[in-house]
Amino acid sequence: MGVLMSKRQTVEQVQKVSLAVSAFKDGLRDRPSIRRTGELPGSRRGTVEGSVQEVQEEKEAEAGTSVVQEESSAGRAAWERLRDGRGVEPEEFDRTSRFTPPAFIRPTRKLDDDKPPEICLEPREPVVNDEMCDVCEVWTAESLFPCRVCTRVFHDGCLRRMGYIQGDSAAEVTEMAHTETGWSCHYCDNINLLLTEEEMYSLTETFQRCKVIPDCSLTLEDFLRYRHQAAKRGDRDRALSEEQEEQAARQFAALDPEHRGHIEWPDFLSHESLLLLQQLRPQNSLLRLLTVKERERARAAFLARGSGSTVSEAECRRAQHSWFCKRFPEAPSCSVSISHVGPIADSSPASSSSKSQDKTLLPTEQESRFVDWPTFLQENVLYILAARPNSAAIHLKPPG
């Protein structure tokens, strides 16, 4: 009987030891691994100083892994912002008093999207701004900021709490919103928001294949390299011609009016979004993107430049450049603020081309040809959309 009891005790002891070893291994597996290069003979392991040193080493190891995780999460966050149509989040912003922006849902194309829309020259469309703030949906006697593209209006405080204006930019927005120049709200300022999910997926895939990093500025070398890689997509033997490369360089200069040597990410994204819209959308689909204010702006330009129901092809070409000018010669009957917000520098390529366009841009043959109202709209719709952002950059440079 005694022998049987000793065997059972032995088994129980072995089981207890096995459980203890398993628990110890599990604890080591959960702890962050710390590589020890070897203990010196005079090591302080087991002392208070040794314990403090071990804790410090553990913190350093955890900090190293957290840095790697932060870098990878920052990259994922950049692609997520690009996918969702959001800009760079403000790093130093008091989020305790911030309004939560509504979830953005990308537009979808309807079945009749490619059918001609009914945009008549006459009668004129009435332009009436909303009465309530788009953020808080409250009407107050305070001055509201109207968007020059859509009919939305905003409170100064609401824009601050949403994080769309910060610091000194509030005074600039206030000045622009109540002048002829006008101001574009955060919906209209970002042309990328016009893309559908499928179009955005195509653009993101192109960026990834061409190794474009979101939220980073691009130099002329980066821009030309991207243009070459994008041209070779689907056809490795295809390359940009010398003329196309010069055109890309002129577009880069138009996107960099201040001659800083690089273009900002929002300007590059708007430019690429416009090119994708031009490539994938029919003209009728693009016309449906115009707001009532933009349609009235086009009517004013057509009536001011033509006589009756037609304008010369030369005037139609000049109109493509006029959307990017700070001031626009409106018709007397139009009371809508229609000018583009970005002034063109005197030394910029766009300014020099616009000054000499009457002499060199348009041949004499174009003066004798005429276009009607629908044709005028189709040839100007992309440049009207390109004039939406508040940036001074020209996001789609007209030919010439």
Swiss-Prot record:
GO-annotated cellular components: cytoplasm; glutamatergic synapse; nucleus; synaptic vesicle membrane
Protein name: PHD finger protein 24
Pfam families registered for this protein in UniProt: zf-RING_15
Modification Phosphoserine, positions: S43, S51
GO terms for MF: transcription corepressor activity; zinc ion binding
Residues that span the membrane, as ranges: none
BP-aspect Gene Ontology terms: detection of mechanical stimulus involved in sensory perception of pain; gamma-aminobutyric acid signaling pathway; regulation of G protein-coupled receptor signaling pathway; regulation of synaptic transmission, GABAergic
Keyword Phosphoprotein set for record: yes
Entries under Gene3D superfamilies matching the protein: Zinc/RING finger domain, C3HC4 (zinc finger)
Region described as Disordered: 28-99
Highest taxon in the source lineage: Eukaryota
Positions of modified residues (Omega-N-methylarginine): R36
Modified positions (Phosphothreonine) in chain numbering: T47
Regions of compositional bias (Basic and acidic residues) in chain numbering: 28-38, 78-97
Lipidation (N-myristoyl glycine): G2
Span of zinc fingers (PHD-type): 129-190
Keywords linked to the UniProt accession: Lipoprotein, Metal-binding, Methylation, Myristate, Phosphoprotein, Zinc, Zinc-finger
